[in-house]
Amino acid sequence: LLTQQIGAILDEISNLKVTMCNVFIDKKNPLASITTSISKKAYTNKPLILIDDVLNSGTTLIYGVKHFLEVPLKRFKTAVLVNRNHKKYPIKADFKGISLSTSIKEHVQVEFSKKNEAVAYLI
């Protein structure tokens, strides 16, 4: 939903041709094969923004980055809605919605309403 909202805004404010792509990562086994909803040819030599809801340990984002580095890209950026700064990996978000100082034991949950509004909860 987050990527769809960003794509809709980009369509509204620019003349960029935006192609949305879902990335499928097994969070319990991130070394397993990562797949996308579009072919590699569709994003080869194109600018790409990899978007995640919460950047916590960095595991999901870094394995996603690894997947897209297998093809040449024109430009590569990352974006997250919530940045928690508890990274296990040397990964950063180029674009952040909000940075939260939380303890490692706390949990951030992002939910999207039917009105396409995002709400983040600290649990």
Task: Label each region the model flagged.
Residues 1-123:
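PRPP-associated nucleotide enzymes
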